[in-house]
């Protein structure tokens, strides 16, 4: 079904200086050019010139992917593949845009015929980084079915919650998770179709590999309005049960062009590798829409578990030009001897998900000669702020607002605050709601309404803007610590902690105190070399280090060493769980 092609290194194609923007997408780029560093040498002028027109009808598969197929056939695109997959066994697979189109149309016919799905039906997709995950994404676009990704780390309880809350009609997964689905399927009244990606058959499941052998690649893409729901993403659940975030064909299908063009700086000649788990919106950001709207190659490595040396070897062996990974990954990579690897093709590195500490970016730059361009966004949005090529990077800053959004710091009444004052990070949505923003939380109107304050969508994050227009993250609104009249964000304290050689990871929360009301408490995971040290002495050393690194009133008056931090399935620290533990006796 999925033909394996022989291994050989990609020939570097000369970068196109111009990118034709097809049909309904043309309004995205006023000058029809891909991003270049000089775009942001004059940030204000660039942002002012940015224009967007949203067409009434838009479907990413038809209006972008199929158009790249036409460019490819006409020889008007570099010879990069659309998709390049490898695994640890040395197997490789590459598809052109034409092959991607043919295979995804077969998959679309399976959804419509074998699964009896109709436009608007909901499809939960739980697969690791296998080629079928990308085909399923495009097949859902072609059929107008609503994609709902999930991570392979979900438990049986998690799967039940997602099936029931989303009212999913179909689930696509592998033989590892199929037993968990079968165990809860009888409790999910809307579920009527199950597809398995496996070499083996399973009772009650359609086998995708077998169905693909007989499916037709003749399929007419549905005509979707730009504001139809395209996908539902579950949030990571850092402050409670995961919410269902609805995105339209335009909010991600068009909105993520801002990411691809400006933040990722992609052209049709680029090979982009994003290491995000397939269950999260970040994979939609950087493994589907952002690279493909620019005609770039999506590269992926099916690593069953995180292996720093495998990542470094892959960056060295393959012609990857743009690399995107989480701050935790970069932190682990810089602990290795990077200088023994040569990244001959790599030219641009980005990170998102959580703030990246300045010490990590400095180590990466010293070892590779490359900056890490941090970006800030949410499941609910495309890129909100970013450090863009051609712009001065301020280490630790989220950068400046993306061209898509008017971002401000606002107070509790929705008034805009001046530079230097901490407040809530908001995106202006009135009088004109920007593209690239979710529509609502599914079946949760009260939560949707709570995100609006005056003319702004409130992100739930605290921050401030400096005099140069750069935004700085302080904390999730509910993570801020109030001690003796001071407002303390955990991120700056964690930054200071993580710079101490004994600290592998840390999380900072509030802890009750009879005099100050609450104080800063640090939960610290020690590096192996320090686990045998005298803990009382080590606590004093760490506290003194923080006092010297940041404002003394922010130092953790309480320190507890733990084996590991509690984290969400997406790898984000669950500070709320640590905070509840501290306050449970009050």
Curated annotation (Swiss-Prot):
Enzyme class: ligase
Cofactor list: Mg(2+); Mn(2+)
Binding of ATP, residues: 235-243, 374-379, 461, 476, 572
Subcellular location: Mitochondrion; Mitochondrion matrix
UniProt modified residues of type N6-acetyllysine: 157
GO cellular component, one term: mitochondrion
Stretch forming the transit peptide: 1-27
Enzyme Commission number(s) of this protein: 6.2.1.2, 6.2.1.17
Lineage: superkingdom: Eukaryota
Modified residues annotated as N6-succinyllysine in this record: 73, 106
InterPro entries found in the cross-reference section: AMP-bd_C, AMP-bd_C_sf, AMP-binding_CS, AMP-dep_synth/lig_dom, ANL_N_sf, Mitochondrial_ACSM
GO biological-process terms attached to the record: acyl-CoA metabolic process; cholesterol homeostasis; fatty acid biosynthetic process; regulation of blood pressure
Keyword Ligase: yes
CDD domains per the UniProt record, alphabetical: MACS_euk
Magnesium among keywords: yes
Family statement drawn from the similarity comment of this UniProt entry: Belongs to the ATP-dependent AMP-binding enzyme family.
Role this protein plays: Catalyzes the activation of fatty acids by CoA to produce an acyl-CoA, the first step in fatty acid metabolism. Capable of activating medium-chain fatty acids with a preference for isobutyrate among fatty acids with 2-6 carbon atoms.
Protein name per its UniProtKB record: Acyl-coenzyme A synthetase ACSM3, mitochondrial
Organism: Homo sapiens (Human)
Gene name per UniProt: ACSM3
